[in-house]
């Protein structure tokens, strides 16, 4: 087939929401359930050709997403409703497409992203939850959210996050730029909201694990700054559980004009 006869290739971006509790993470892997595998299967059915997706952030086992962004290329020309309603009809109930947008050739869900934003939800109550048990992390000791917020502000800006980096992290550098980190209380829920250019492996969960020690008055407010300066993972607290973590937003240059739906999860406003 000559170049003139080649069908046009369309590049499509999707916003994806998922409950990660029954998946072994985002990334497709042999013999285990992954969000990527389910999404690619549904897209391939609608496109009637094999589809491979690329995501903004590969979330770990049990981690959720309300603002994941993916892109894929296809020769299939479909209406937006096919990529949303049609794909959703082929997806399991715990994964959904939130929006669709045709993007230019230079767009890449991961490499075009300028920042990622996560929210970590702690159910801070003496008794464990039942209904939202896989969507929040239960912590029974009373937490001082204002104390946690103050302690966290030392993490702003460009820093070496070795103390909050998983041992198995494959990133070439531990340096990341944190744009904001806020800790707020909403009734029995404590929310840690953090935005950075990128994250090292388990960075949010390791930060939250140590902040909970400060919030429970087991460590002084100055402890987080001391951990950051020490550059030693063994000094920090245990990694917080996956259940409470959500990828809520990914930032891109304005020229791509991607939709920005409410981040959530649940009752949380922007």
From Swiss-Prot:
Highest taxon of source: Bacteria
Reaction equations catalysed: uridine(38/39/40) in tRNA = pseudouridine(38/39/40) in tRNA
Entry keyword Transferase: no
InterPro entries xref list: PsdUridine_synth_cat_dom_sf (IPR020103), PsdUridine_synth_TruA (IPR001406), PsdUridine_synth_TruA_a/b_dom (IPR020097), PsdUridine_synth_TruA_C (IPR020095), TruA/RsuA/RluB/E/F_N (IPR020094)
Effect of residue 58 to A: Loss of activity
GO biological process: tRNA pseudouridine synthesis
Cross-referenced Pfam families: PseudoU_synth_1 (PF01416)
Enzyme Commission code(s) on record: 5.4.99.12
Family per similarity comment: Belongs to the tRNA pseudouridine synthase TruA family.
Quaternary state and interactors: Homodimer.
Record NCBIfam families: hisT_truA (TIGR00071)
Stated role: Formation of pseudouridine at positions 38, 39 and 40 in the anticodon stem and loop of transfer RNAs.
Protein name, entry field: tRNA pseudouridine synthase A
Organism the protein comes from: Escherichia coli (strain K12)
Gene encoding the protein: truA
């Amino acid at each position: 087939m000559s170049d003139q006869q080649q069908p046009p290739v369309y590049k499509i971006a999707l916003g994806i929401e998922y409950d990660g509790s029954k998946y072994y993470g985002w990334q497709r892997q042999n013999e285990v359930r992954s969000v990527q595998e389910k999404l690619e299967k549904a897209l391939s059915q609608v496109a009637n050709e094999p589809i491979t997706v690329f995501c903004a952030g590969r979330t770990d086992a049990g981690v959720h997403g309300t603002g994941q962004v993916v892109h894929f290329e296809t020769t299939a020309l479909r209406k937006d409703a096919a990529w949303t309603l049609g794909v959703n009809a082929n997806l399991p109930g715990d994964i959904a497409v939130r929006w669709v947008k045709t993007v230019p050739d230079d767009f890449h869900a991961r490499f075009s992203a300028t920042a990622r934003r996560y929210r970590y939800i702690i159910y801070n109550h003496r008794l464990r939850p039942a209904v939202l048990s896989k969507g929040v992390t239960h912590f029974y000791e009373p937490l001082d959210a204002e104390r946690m917020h103050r302690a966290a502000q030392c993490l702003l800006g460009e820093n070496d996050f070795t103390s909050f980096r998983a041992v198995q992290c494959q990133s070439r550098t531990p340096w990341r730029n944190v744009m904001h980190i806020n800790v707020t209380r909403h009734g029995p829920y404590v929310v840690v909201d953090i935005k950075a250019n990128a994250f090292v492996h388990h960075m949010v969960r390791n930060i939250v694990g140590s902040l909970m020690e400060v919030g429970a008055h087991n460590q002084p407010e100055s402890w987080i700054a001391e951990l950051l300066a020490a550059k030693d993972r063994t000094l920090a607290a245990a990694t917080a559980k996956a259940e409470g973590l959500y990828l809520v937003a990914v930032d891109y240059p304005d020229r791509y004009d991607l939709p920005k739906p409410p981040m959530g999860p649940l009752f949380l406003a922007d």
